A protein has these predicted regions:
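Soluble ligand-binding/transfer domains with enclosed cavities or grooves
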Residues: 3-270
Length: 273
């Protein structure tokens, strides 16, 4: 199986118990995955040498559940007003309950039935607020390989009647901001598609999609997550690792609708305590 999209879809409610309630969890005798991918090489889009990624950042991909997360969200007016209304609905649905300002997040990774999902390396991820155990996000992650051999992250979020799937390409951050003194790289995960040099093909597979049954529609949404090891001097000053004691990774996550940025999330990751 090398499906781009998952078969999973939500009912009226998703919630933190989605995989259990839908009997999608893998049997207990199956090894549980630890991260969004098994190896960082599984996301090699053939645009740079992934072996140069800073090892602290690799932990986010390969051992995701071992990290605690602090999020600070900065909503852009008037989306900041609209979000307070939309968030009430999404709390009831139990999906995409992003912070208004700040949240401490716990992440759990599960083995799931890959036949039901339809993707060969799918795994479930549930993120909840540490203080309340309320769900923030429910997702099934896998990888996708296109006809040119480029690999992408395929992140599926069940929603009522279908799902939203982000096909994300792993890039390096260019310039001096993206490399430390030892040549180790910061990275970006992006849904912005592009044409690759020396190829006549149309733009690559990156994007965000609404998926309903066999139908998929490209959404007017884009996101980009830039990640640095906290020790990298090139990280943005706004991502001071002292904000969350023990931080090893910092990140900036921008989300856009029709090209207009509506929110920026700042992330601090540290080993679970």
């Amino acid at each position: 199986m090398n499906a781009r999209f998952s078969r999973l879809r939500g009912g009226l409610r998703v919630g933190a118990d989605f995989f259990l309630r839908r009997a999608i969890l893998a049997p207990s005798n199956v090894d549980c995955p630890r991260g969004l991918v098994d190896r960082i090489e599984d996301l090699d889009a053939r645009t740079f040498d992934v072996s140069r990624i800073h090892p602290d950042i690799v932990v986010f991909f390969e051992d995701t559940g071992a990290l605690d997360l602090l999020i600070r969200s900065h909503w852009v007016f008037p989306f900041s007003i609209a979000w307070r209304v939309v968030r009430v609905v999404l709390r009831w649905v139990g999906q995409f309950v992003l912070p208004i300002r700040e949240g401490r997040i716990a992440t759990r990774v599960f083995g799931i039935d890959r036949e039901q999902d339809g993707r060969a390396d799918a795994r479930g991820v549930v993120r909840t607020y540490e203080e309340t155990s309320e769900v923030m996000q429910v997702a099934a992650y896998a990888t996708h390989q296109d006809a040119q051999g480029r690999r992408y992250m395929s992140a599926t979020f069940p929603m009522p009647g279908g799902n939203i799937t982000g096909i994300l390409r792993l890039d390096r951050i260019e310039g001096t901001q993206g490399e430390d003194q030892e040549g180790r790289l910061a990275i970006a995960l992006t849904s912005v598609s592009k044409r690759h040099p020396n190829e006549q093909a149309e733009r690559d597979a990156a994007g965000v999609w609404f998926v309903i049954g066999r139908w998929s529609i490209r959404a007017p949404l884009h996101e980009q997550i830039e990640m640095w090891a906290s020790a990298m001097p090139s990280r943005p000053a706004s991502l001071d690792p002292k904000i969350f004691e023990g931080t090893t990774i910092v990140a900036k996550h921008e989300q856009r609708l029709f090209g207009v940025r509506f929110v920026t999330h700042h992330y601090w990751f540290r080993p679970r305590r």
